[in-house]
Design a protein with these regions (language model features):
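Acidic, mature catalytic/reactive cores of soluble proteins
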Residues: 1-390
Length: 390
């Protein structure tokens, strides 16, 4: 119900949260405007909606994502970088403004409207967008000619631009880096595009796409792996851990039983997990351009549940999931973060947190019934074709 109320019916776009300026740290500066739609949410939204049987809503959001892809490719002039976020109507003027005459909850400042991250380079969005398209395609709604042409243009662009620093999934304001998560998602983008092209017989430069996909894989496995930490790290020049990498087995980049992955998960257990709750990373060890600290991330905790379940630690996954449920409010809703004393922090309710909750519940239930592994339960279940929107 909450996710449907956060969806703009004319376009199917889902806002990240209906609020702005609720602080990630009481009295701190980590206050953002979330009243927009992130491309990043697409894959996780489509997966959750399909898992709950809301195929029409999944198709509508998938079509909204495709429309954004078409805007940046398929016109015969090559592709251009997508924006990472848009207004619900698809426009992208999100200039950030500080409202000096306001203060947020318990004096938290500054209060911002708009979002300066809209102009950042975040290469992971291509993986999340193509994963959403692939999930929709797997349920019968294949890309139309214009849509596929735009996707092909976009993948050709990505082949030429994936190997560069960006601001990353956490939208840091401390400079661009070679973030491992972004590289993983670039691999996802090309992998899913190859699957669609081969499965549907669509024209594509498959040799180029496969070559670059494999180059990304080799780079991540060598430069993303830190032999001293015995873990995959946040970016190539650090020993800092990052819970965004919990998606590596979720996206099929590594086996959930790969020894390198199991060592990474063990390292996260020790450094990023506190009483079953998961931090994104250590801001003091990896400066992100902002002051202060933050709470644990609800999204990351649910990713942790999923990763534990797929890696065979079903008892641990159940315990973390049950513990996390105790932090919801009286309506079962979550904000973006949870503080050290159990208070909810950040914008509320946050779509990403609830999408991750749904996905973790679906996957945990499937693993408990069928045994741990990397089978994708939504696609493993029988399901009819998705109706074409409109």
């Amino acid at each position: 119900m909450t996710l449907k109320l956060m969806t703009y019916q004319p376009t199917g776009a889902l806002v990240a949260a209906p609020t702005a300026g609720l602080p990630e740290q009481t009295g701190g500066e980590r206050n953002w405007d979330y009243r927009y739609t992130w491309i990043r949410d697409a894959s996780f939204s489509v997966y959750a909606l399909l898992g709950l049987g809301y195929v029409g809503e999944a198709a509508a959001f998938g079509q909204w994502v495709r429309d954004r892809v078409v805007e940046h490719g398929g016109n015969g002039n090559g592709a251009s970088p997508m924006k990472i976020m848009y207004r619900v109507d698809g426009t992208s003027d999100l200039s950030e403004e500080i409202l000096d005459h306001f203060e947020g909850w318990r004096g938290s400042r500054p209060v911002r409207i708009g979002n300066g991250a809209a102009d950042q380079l975040q290469l992971d969005i291509y993986g999340e967008a193509l994963d959403a398209v692939a999930k929709i395609d797997a349920r019968g709604l294949q890309p139309a000619y214009q849509g596929w042409t735009a996707i092909a243009d976009m993948m050709n662009w990505l082949c030429d631009h994936w190997d560069q620093p960006d601001e990353g999934v956490w939208e840091t304001r401390g400079g661009r880096k070679n973030f491992t998560y972004g590289r993983v998602q670039c691999w996802v983008a090309l992998d899913r595009a190859i699957r669609i092209a081969e499965g549907r017989g669509r024209p594509a430069d498959i040799i180029k796409w496969r070559t670059e996909r494999d180059n990304i894989y080799q780079q991540v496995m060598t430069r993303g792996w830190n032999p001293k930490r015995h873990a995959f790290t946040q970016h190539y020049d650090t020993d800092v851990l990052d819970s965004s990498l919990l998606v590596m087995p979720l996206m099929g980049f590594v086996s959930p039983y790969d020894p390198l992955w199991l060592q990474t998960l063990q390292a996260m257990d020790s450094e990023l997990v506190s009483d079953s709750l998961v931090y994104r990373y250590n801001p003091s060890a990896s400066p992100d351009g902002l002051g202060g600290n933050e709470g644990t991330f609800s999204l990351c905790t649910f990713w942790y549940v999923d990763a534990l379940a797929r890696s065979g630690r079903l008892t641990d996954a159940e315990l973390v999931f049950q513990k996390m449920n105790t932090y919801a409010n009286h309506l079962g809703l979550y904000s973006e973060e949870i503080g050290s004393t159990g208070e909810q922090l950040g914008n509320f309710p946050q779509a990403f947190s609830h999408l991750a909750l749904i996905n973790a519940a679906i996957n945990l239930d499937y693993q408990l019934d069928h045994g741990a592994g990397d089978v994708e339960p939504v696609l493993a279940r029988a399901g009819g074709a998705i109706p074409v929107p409109g």
